[in-house]
Amino acid sequence: MEEVDNIIIHTLRQIGCEIPEEIQSLREFTTTVIVQASSKCLHVINEDIDIPSNLPSSMSAKFRVGTMLAAALQDLGYRGEIGYQTFLYSNEKDIRSVFMFLVEHLPKETSLAASEPLGSSVLLNRRVASDLAQRLTLSWTPTFLKKGGVRWKGSKPKTYFREGSASMRRFHACNLKSPQGLTDLTAKISKETKAYYSVIPYVTSQPPCRQDVVPSVLESNSLSVTAVAEWELEWNQSGLSSRLTKEEYLARKRQRLEKKIKDHVLAEMQRVEAGGRAASDLSDIVSSFSDRVSTIESQTQGSRFTRTEKLQFAQDEQKAAAMAGLSESGPPKMDTEEELQKKREQELEALQNKLKDLASSVDEKKSEIKTMNAGLQQTNEQVTATKVQNSEHEESYKVKKRTVDLLPDAENNIAKLQGVVDSSSQRLVNLAQQWETHRTALIDEYRELKVINANKVSETQKKLEEIKSLREKMKEVAEETRGKDDLYKQLVSEYERMSRDVNRSAYTRRILEIVGNIKKQKEEINKILVDTKSVQKEINQLSGKLDRTFTVTDELIFRDAKKDEACRKAYKYLASLHENCKELIQAVEDTGVIMREIRDLEEQIDTESQRNTANNLERITADHKQMKEENATLTKKIKALKSS
């Protein structure tokens, strides 16, 4: 933190803060220096903010100044805990975060506003702007002098670069085929698959154009990465909670998809059949209408063909006469717009009446069809009910017929039936006794299996909760790493945009050291994540192996426990050993939790020790005494004014 403190102190001195030369870190800042520097930074950021830079002697005025500073920082977007105590009774950590926030928001002459978020889009826009500015400073060169758009850049840094878009190609990707599932060396590959993989052309030969190789590879890689990310997200959200293996989860998902496809196909087939029925109904209506027209035509002389031919020729002659403006009566007669409009309205009304008649007839037919369907359904129900009654009557008839057949030799038949009933009752008693003997053993086994299942469910739930917590920690670490990467990019971009006329090698070296520390922390975090994953995987494997071993051993010993006393004792020892192992594992987990809590408490103790609580308490006590004295003087003045 010394480098950060030096950068903050140097920046505060540059904007005009009076900081003594002997102060080398934020730990040495007094309340007066903190208030002065904060007020100066706020005024530089926003000139409308005017807060006193010197603390007054009155305690109420001091509290007012501290509250104004805290409110101004909150208006700027500071999200940490802040109040008047941050400035009057400060600690190193809070003051460092406050000054880092203020320094980031200070305006810079050589860059954009520091409060601008530097995301990937902003960095891209800045890079495009710098590249365009660089291109505008260069002289124009004809295209035929630049082979592939490459030209020499004489200024620093001296290098070749590509100019223009003549040599660029469109991003066109093709579907690539490559061997799958070869990463697992233990898996067996069939001969057919090997033969297929042997004849697959190389990836560089699959696209039709050579320029499409790189886009195709990039597209294939992005698709595979996206598929893996989507599968991990789906497995974390739905797969773990389902308590199924990956193969079972995929099989169930495949069944759901097949069912959806089947339902969709059936719905489409029903829709097409319904459309066909509607089309057939419409064709029936049209045919009936044409039959009516044919009956009307049949009443006139001539065949239908000659009649339609005459009508066509008559219509053509009438149209020609209307176009020529001639009529049989004599001079041409032109229809007015009103007459034409009336004719159109009459024709439209006639067509609407015909349409209404057709619609009413269609509705009547539909209602008749509905009534017929209802009657048909009712008839079918009556038929089924009649069939059921007939079957019942047939059964009763068979029973009565057998009874009548037995009546001639009633005494012998009754004795035989009594013997059958007695044997059946005796067999039922024997079966009940056998069931009781097996029932107790089955109930005991059921209870044991129920207890084992409950233990497994609780252990599985614990493992799932641990996995979820680990995944949340991994996400937090990944977000923290991403934030540090963004900070690294921001620092690098700011360093590249800084003017080179000022000698800032020391601060650049410190920034690079900070970046190196960030990289080391990132590597350590990645190493910890890898170790955590491996340990979790090993724990899962060992727990699964332990459960399977215990289950097999339990079955083998329990099979012989009823016959052998030694096996019974061994079974008891096995159960006690299993319970003791569970208690031991629980004790180890509790010990780990306690150790983690101890580390957290130690960290809290360290943070509390850095807050200078004792010094702040002394200062608060002194301020409290000063407030009492001020209150006493004020009460004396009030009494003197009242007495006068």
Curated annotation (Swiss-Prot):
GO molecular function, one term: cullin family protein binding
Keyword entries, A-Z: Coiled coil
Protein name, entry field: Coiled-coil domain-containing protein 22 homolog
Region (Disordered): 316-341
Listed Pfam families: CCDC22_CC (PF05667), CCDC22_N (PF21674)
Domain of life per record: Eukaryota
Signal peptide interval: none
Residue ranges the record marks as coiled coil: 333-383, 409-486, 592-644
GO terms of biological process kind: positive regulation of ubiquitin-dependent protein catabolic process
Family: Belongs to the CCDC22 family.
